[in-house]
Amino acid sequence: MQSITVALDAMGGDFGPRVTVPAAVQALSHFPELKVILIGDQSLITSQLSQLGTSTSSRLSILHSEKVISNSEKPSLALRNSQNSSMRMAIDLVSDNEADACVSGGNTGALMALSRFVLKLLPGIERPALVSALPTISGKRTWMLDLGANVSCDADSLFQFAVMGSALAEEHLGRPPRVAVLNIGAEEIKGNDLVKRCAEMLSQTDAINFVGYIEGNQILHDVADVIVCDGFVGNVCLKASEGTAQLFIEKLKTSMMASTIKGWIARKLFSRLFNELKTLNPDQYNGASLLGLRGIVIKSHGSADVSAIVNALGEAVHEVKRQVPSRISDRLEAVLLERHY
């Protein structure tokens, strides 16, 4: 079995080593091929390992860093002051081929800027895009991009997002994914010039299985496998859907506590419903991919807990196995060749 090494920014996110270290330990038991390099304050990481009753090994190592990029730091400032930071060192390991992928829950803007600066973009890609899987009513997943890396885009960028998202989704699904553009209506006359131009470009491309427009209320209804939008719209949709899912789960918990139904009937009724709603938990889909780079970078939620970070590490393992950057490059080359002729 070929090993896969992931550089984990242990200081990234709201809770730092308190969640990243136990997540790394858990991930090693989930993925036998995985090796993790924890980058961050060595004393804090070692302390967390001691509390877990474990230590470094051939599959778990520590790389000490002196600095942490704060969530409030501007990307331009992060670029200038990134040396010896846990995030920069994690990305550098990928660039130096000492790690196959990196995972960070840190500052999203800084992560995008540093990744683009260090790893560079794939040929033909103008901007990287942030993509993540979302749950659907059928129990399957749909991938949505961009989720905030680019708050304003042109039609060419949206087209490239569609190509990248299609390549990623196909590696998960094993079939050509259905690609749709997010719009305010399903009719061809609806929408602004941006989405209309993107839809026109996609409809003329045989390499993309374009199924037309999708409205916001259809995002979680398994109508499309890949949903394309600019980063402003995508981030708002993502946060709204996550908040709605959390609302349902919390409401159910409150109802369970207040219920007058007793005994095994209550346990049966609420446990079944709770298990169904747990599939909407955003933590199960943690691990947004920064696509378009010459390396694999996974963005974890800043507020992610241990299980959510394990999922992000799992996404990194999957993308390394499937060689996602190469797949995207091949797909883009085929699409550009088709458009040229």
Swiss-Prot record:
Taxonomy of the source species: Bacteria, Pseudomonadati, Pseudomonadota, Gammaproteobacteria, Vibrionales
Source organism: Vibrio campbellii (strain ATCC BAA-1116)
Xref: NCBIfam families: plsX
Name this protein carries in UniProt: Phosphate acyltransferase
Gene Ontology terms: cellular component: cytoplasm
Keyword Transport: no
Functional summary from the UniProt entry: Catalyzes the reversible formation of acyl-phosphate (acyl-PO(4)) from acyl-[acyl-carrier-protein] (acyl-ACP). This enzyme utilizes acyl-ACP as fatty acyl donor, but not acyl-CoA.
Superkingdom field: Bacteria
Principal location listed in the UniProt entry: cytoplasm
A Pfam family hit: FA_synthesis
Keywords carried by this UniProt record: Cytoplasm, Lipid biosynthesis, Lipid metabolism, Phospholipid biosynthesis, Phospholipid metabolism, Transferase
Assembly and interaction partners: Homodimer. Probably interacts with PlsY.
MF terms (GO), sorted A to Z: phosphate:acyl-[acyl carrier protein] acyltransferase activity
Pathway: Lipid metabolism; phospholipid metabolism
UniProt cross-references to InterPro entries, sorted A to Z: FA_synthesis, Phospholipid_synth_PlsX-like
Keyword Lipid biosynthesis attached: yes
Gene3D superfamilies per the UniProt record, alphabetical: Isopropylmalate Dehydrogenase
Subcellular location: Cytoplasm
GO biological process: fatty acid biosynthetic process; phospholipid biosynthetic process
Catalytic reaction list: a fatty acyl-[ACP] + phosphate = an acyl phosphate + holo-[ACP]
Catalytic class of the enzyme: transferase
Similarity section: Belongs to the PlsX family.
EC number from the UniProt entry: 2.3.1.274
